[in-house]
Each structure stands twice: as C-alpha cells, then as structure tokens.
C-alpha cells in the first residue's frame, strides 16, 4: 500500500471520463468508478442516483456520505494536487488546459466497421450457440438410449433366469414323480408276486370241503387286486368283515395229506348277506381309511399269519370274541355318525360307542382290531366258531332294533330348515314389496278429479242458483211497486254485463236468451196491467218531466 501511494499517478487516471479534464475534488463511487465532484452533482444527484458507467444504484451511499460530507476522496485529491498543481489551479479558476486539448487532437481517428461485419459476427455467434445446443441434445439422446438398452438387457437377463429356474423346478418335479412312480410300480409288482406265490403254495396244501369255501377264496383273491384299484369295494369288504356275523372269520382248514399245515381262510362276506344288511357305503371317508390301512399293513399281516400258522402259536378264541364285541361297538358309532338314518345302536353300549367315536380316530381303531383278529386266531377255531357266531348274532340283532338319531345330523337338518324358511320369507316379502310398489305407481299415475282435489273439474254454475234468482224476481213482481224500483236496473246491469263480456266471440246460450225474453214479456204485462202510478215509477228518474206528467201528479194527489 505504501508503494502504491508513493508511485506517481498516470495522467490517464487523473482525467475525468465525463468532462475529459483534470479531476477536481474526485468522488470514488462504490463501483470503483471515479469522476469529479461537479460532474457527480450534475449527472448523479440531479439526473438519477446511479453510476453513469455501470448503472449501479448508489442512492443510499450518496445520501449517507453527503450527510457526513465524505463524498470527496481526499487522499486521491491530495495526490492529484501534488503531482499536477498547475492543472488543478487552472481548473479551479475555470480555464481549460492546453495540454488536454493537444492530447485530444493527437488522438487517432475512430475506425468504423465494414458493411456486414456486425451481421457476420452475429450469425457466427448464433451458429456457434446452435451447434452447442445440438451437441448437448445429441449427448442427452445417446445417454438415454444407453440407459434404455441397459434396462432392457437387465430385464431380459431376469426373464432368462426366471425361466431357467422354472424349468429346473419342473425337471426336478418330473424326476421326483418318475422315482415315485417307479417305486410304486416295484412295490405293486412285489406284492402281486408274493400274493401269486402264496396262493400257488396254499392251493396245493388246502383241501376245500365245500363249494362255498371255493367261492370265498376266489373273492378274497379278487379283493386283494381290488384293494389297489377300487377303494370303495375294499372299504365294503373291510367294514363288512367286522359287522357280518355269518362270515366265517379266522377258521382253519387242515390238509390231511401233507403234514397238516394250517391256513387261514379268506375273510370275505357273500353278496347276499351284504344285500340283507343294507349297509350303504357311499361316504368316501371309510374307503380312504381302509385304503391307508390296507396299503400299510397288508404285507405285514400276511407275513405274521404265515409265521403263526407254521409255528402253531395261536391263542384262544376268548380274546377274539371280546375284540369282535368292541369292533361291533366301534362300527355302531361310525355308522351312527356317518349314516344317521341307518344307525346301529345297542341300549347298553350306546354311550360307550359315542365316546369311542369322539376320542379315537376311525382308521386307527379299524387297523388295530384287524391286526388282533389275525393274531388271535387259533387252531381249535372249528369247535368254538359256533359260539362266536351266536354272540355276534345277538349283538347285531340288538343293534338293528334300536336306531339312534345323530345329534350332528339333527343340528344340520334344523339349520337347513331354518335357512330354507328364512329364504322363503324373504322371497314373500320381496313379492309383497313389488306388488305394493306397483299399486303405488298406479295410484300416482291416476288423476283425481274429485271435489276439493287439485285436479278437479271446473264445473258450471248450478241451476239451483238460477232458479233462486227467478223466484226472487217473481217475489219482487208480486211485491208493491215502490219495492220494485231497483229490480229493472239490476237486470239491465246484468244484461249489460252479459252483453259486454270480455270474450267478444262468446255467443249467449239459447236458454239464457229464452229466459230473458220471458222475463221481458212478463215485465211488459205487469207494466200494462199496473196503474198510472206504476208507469210513473218505472220511468227513468233523471228524465225531464213533461206537462202531462205534472198534471198526472197533481191529479193523483
């Protein structure tokens, strides 16, 4: 700062840009433009409070410094006075400096632009700006295309991954299904092979004494095949085995020829007994239960039967009798729950059957009883088969006599009846509402023309009023003449009203004309029959009396 202050000011910085003379009391504006005080007073304060070079508003700054009298840059003014004292003195005295005039004269002449030069510069600038704009738009378009391509590629990749995952899952599922089908087919082949081998071995050893036993064996073999094909038929066989008292359960036929090997007979009832019982097995639950039971325990039961028959380890038939009783109770509960119309119930075991049906699952109970039946068969069953059949006949005869209504089925029937009744009542209410709405619409469409209604007919005046008027006229005619003064005037007024009605095209009715003619005739007759006094009275009052009238009045007096 000190070096700048010590350096001499160039002459160009000491000249006012407005008056082109030495600065006199220079004023430095906030925008760093400097001009002399007289020029500041003339241009800024009087014209506008803005800088004459950059148009910056300096009103606040000018008011503040004029109030404090600090408009003049004293430091610059002192330096100018030190460097150029003569010019400052000459300027203060009002004389023009010759040096400045010489400098102005020595300035080079201004150069003018060539024709079309400015237009060319303008067009060049416009083309430059347009090129920049096009380049920017092209860059934006390219960026948007790249982004769209990127999004499409990502979406295609996601779709491809999803399709691959779905295809992989389908292939895995197909593999699992193939393995399951293969295992099922192998199990089915093994079971069929074992059944065929067992049947071939037993056919040599078993000697059937009766033709009914051959029929039962054939039905048993067919039942083994139907166990895999028709679950409903298997369910019929499985349930009737526990309920049919006449089926020969667990009795043994000995082969007299070959080492007396025992063999279990098939547990299949005849079709005639099924028809006699009338058990209708149309519910899918029993067939499903027995299908699961047959699939899980068929081979184990056959193996256990063979081992027990070969070893000869059979227990007594007392346990089988108890199990048959429990099986009958369970079957009563199942048939009572599923078929309420054909329920089987014994009076002493009714509560037990209901509790057993609620507490234990049906298919588990059936599987347990079938296993124990096969395990508890003994060699001496021929002697005790009759007692077993008698016990079962007694139990089933008691159950057939006493049907039990199912509580659940009764509730369902009652609920269905309530719903049907409610539906019927709602339909009746709907029909009644429609009928009432139709009647209401019909009443609204009808027009009431009765008396007192807004749409009543505008009737003519009654004939009774006209008759009363005629009677009044007759009474007036019969009355003395002074009372009959005003009557003709009223009739005339009424006639004039009828004649001068507002409707000019309206014609008088024929009856009124006839009636008016009769009234006039009667009045004329009355006037002729009356005395001269009556004639005088009927004359108009405002008429000027004649001499004859005066003589008549005097004669009358």
Curated annotation (Swiss-Prot):
Record EC number: 2.3.2.27
GO cellular component term, pick one: nucleus
Pfam families per UniProt: zf-C3HC4
Biased amino acid composition, Polar residues: 490-500
InterPro entries (UniProt xref): RNF168, RNF168/RNF169_E3_ubiq-ligase, Znf_C3HC4_RING-type, Znf_RING, Znf_RING/FYVE/PHD
Chemical reaction(s) catalysed: S-ubiquitinyl-[E2 ubiquitin-conjugating enzyme]-L-cysteine + [acceptor protein]-L-lysine = [E2 ubiquitin-conjugating enzyme]-L-cysteine + N(6)-ubiquitinyl-[acceptor protein]-L-lysine
Superkingdom as given in the UniProt entry: Eukaryota
Zinc finger RING-type: from-to: 16-55
Main location: nucleus
Annotated motif MIU motif 2, positions: 422-445
Region feature Disordered, mapped onto this chain: 482-543
Self-association state and partner proteins as the record states: Monomer.
Protein name: E3 ubiquitin-protein ligase rnf168
Species the sequence originates in: Xenopus laevis (African clawed frog)
Gene: rnf168
């Amino acid at each position: 700062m000190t070096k700048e202050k010590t350096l001499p000011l160039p002459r160009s910085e000491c000249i006012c840009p407005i008056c082109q003379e030495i600065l006199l009391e220079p004023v430095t504006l906030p925008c760093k433009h400097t001009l002399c005080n007289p020029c500041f007073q003339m241009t800024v304060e009087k014209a506008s409070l803005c800088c004459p070079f950059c148009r910056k508003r300096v009103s606040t700054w000018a008011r503040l410094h004029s109030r404090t009298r600090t408009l003049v840059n004293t430091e610059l003014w002192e330096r100018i006075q030190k460097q150029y004292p003569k010019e400052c003195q000459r300027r203060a005295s009002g004389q023009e400096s010759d040096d400045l005039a010489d400098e102005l004269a020595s300035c080079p002449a201004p150069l003018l632009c060539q024709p079309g030069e400015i237009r060319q510069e303008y067009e060049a600038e416009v083309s430059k700006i347009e090129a920049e704009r096009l380049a920017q738009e092209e860059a934006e378009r390219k960026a948007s295309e790249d982004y769209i391509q990127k999004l499409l590629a990502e979406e295609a990749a996601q779709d491809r991954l999803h399709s691959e995952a779905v295809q992989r899952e389908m292939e895995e599922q197909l593999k699992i299904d193939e393995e399951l089908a293969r295992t099922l087919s192998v199990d089915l082949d093994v079971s069929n092979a074992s059944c065929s081998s067992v049947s071939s071995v037993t056919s040599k050893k078993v000697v059937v004494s009766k033709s009914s036993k051959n029929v039962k064996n054939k039905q048993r073999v067919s039942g083994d095949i139907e166990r895999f094909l028709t679950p409903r038929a298997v369910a019929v066989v499985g349930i009737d085995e526990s309920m049919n008292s006449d089926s020969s359960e667990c009795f043994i036929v000995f082969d007299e020829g070959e080492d007396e090997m025992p063999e279990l007979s098939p547990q299949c009832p005849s079709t005639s007994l099924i028809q006699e019982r009338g058990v209708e097995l149309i519910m899918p639950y029993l067939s499903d239960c027995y299908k699961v039971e047959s699939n899980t325990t068929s081979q184990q039961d056959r193996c256990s039967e063979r081992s027990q028959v070969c070893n000869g380890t059979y227990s007594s038939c007392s346990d089988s009798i108890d199990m048959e009783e429990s099986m009958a109770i369970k079957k009563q509960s199942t048939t009572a729950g599923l078929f309420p119309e054909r329920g089987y119930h014994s009076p002493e075991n009714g509560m037990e059957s209901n509790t057993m049906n609620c507490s234990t699952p049906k298919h588990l109970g059936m599987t347990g009883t079938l296993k124990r039946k096969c395990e508890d068969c003994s060699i001496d069953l021929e002697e005790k088969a009759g007692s077993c059949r008698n016990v079962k006949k007694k139990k089933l005869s008691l159950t057939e006599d006493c049907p039990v209504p199912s509580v659940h089925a009764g509730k369902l029937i009652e609920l269905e009846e309530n719903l049907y009744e409610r539906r019927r009542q709602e339909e009746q209410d709907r029909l009644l509402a429609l009928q009432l709405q139709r009647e209401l619409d019909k009443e609204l469409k009808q027009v009431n023309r009765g008396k007192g209604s807004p749409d009543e007919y505008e009737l003519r005046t009654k004939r009774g009023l006209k008759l009363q008027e005629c009677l009044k006229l007759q009474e007036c005619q019969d009355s003395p003449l002074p009372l009959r003064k005003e009557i003709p005037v009223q009739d005339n007024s009424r006639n004039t009203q009828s004649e001068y009605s507002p409707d000019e095209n309206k014609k008088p009715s024929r009856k009124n004309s006839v009636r008016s003619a009769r009234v006039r005739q009667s009045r004329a007759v009355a006037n002729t029959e009356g005395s001269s006094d009556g004639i005088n009275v009927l004359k108009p009052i405002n008429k000027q009396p004649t001499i004859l009238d005066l003589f008549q009045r005097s004669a009358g007096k």
